[in-house]
Amino acid sequence: MARNDKNDKNEQTDGLVERLVTVDRVAKVVKGGRIFSFTALTVVGDGNGRVGFGRGKAREVPAAIQKALEAAKRNMITVELNDATLYHPIKARHGASKVYMQPASEGTGVIAGGAMRAVLEVAGVKDVLTKCYGSTNTANVVRATFNGLRDMSTPEKMAAKRGKSVDEILG
């Protein structure tokens, strides 16, 4: 199986940063042999807390990428950020992929692997420390990162949920 990672491909359309995470060639085995097609995984974001991911599959690479981008734009969520980092450490998983993300001080940068880096950068996270455990399947790592960002809560939300003030939560 051929794998072509193209993390350096960034395009800007309608204010969204599009990042191609991976393109894979897949095969369907039929009576007469194999039918090859391509799957693409993309992430899009506005660099200010909105992020989405999508997968597309087609017989040609450009068509698969286009389908993935359309799916990513439909699948966008809003992530509340603490300036350019996270509010608190996050553990998330999808399948056998587990990710850990921790807020970092200003100037640290995005310390992350390829798939996680793509999601965090298009979301607008500038300073974060991350680690991926278990399966490093690109699609599952992207989904786990996405789940973690979606489930992150602000101190205001935590305080309201617990019936306390923000000062009590932050200690």
Swiss-Prot record:
GO biological process per UniProt: translation
A single MF term (Gene Ontology): structural constituent of ribosome
Record-linked SUPFAM superfamilies: dsRNA-binding domain-like, Ribosomal protein S5 domain 2-like
GO cellular component, one term: small ribosomal subunit
Presence of keyword DNA repair: no
Cross-referenced PROSITE patterns: RIBOSOMAL_S5, S5_DSRBD
Function of the molecule: With S4 and S12 plays an important role in translational accuracy. Located at the back of the 30S subunit body where it stabilizes the conformation of the head with respect to the body.
Cross-referenced PANTHER family: MITOCHONDRIAL RIBOSOMAL PROTEIN S5 (PTHR48277:SF1)
Description of how the protein assembles with itself and partners: Part of the 30S ribosomal subunit. Contacts proteins S4 and S8.
Family: Belongs to the universal ribosomal protein uS5 family.
Domain notes: The N-terminal domain interacts with the head of the 30S subunit; the C-terminal domain interacts with the body and contacts protein S4. The interaction surface between S4 and S5 is involved in control of translational fidelity.
HAMAP family found in the cross-reference section: Ribosomal_uS5_B
Protein name: Small ribosomal subunit protein uS5
Gene for this chain: rpsE
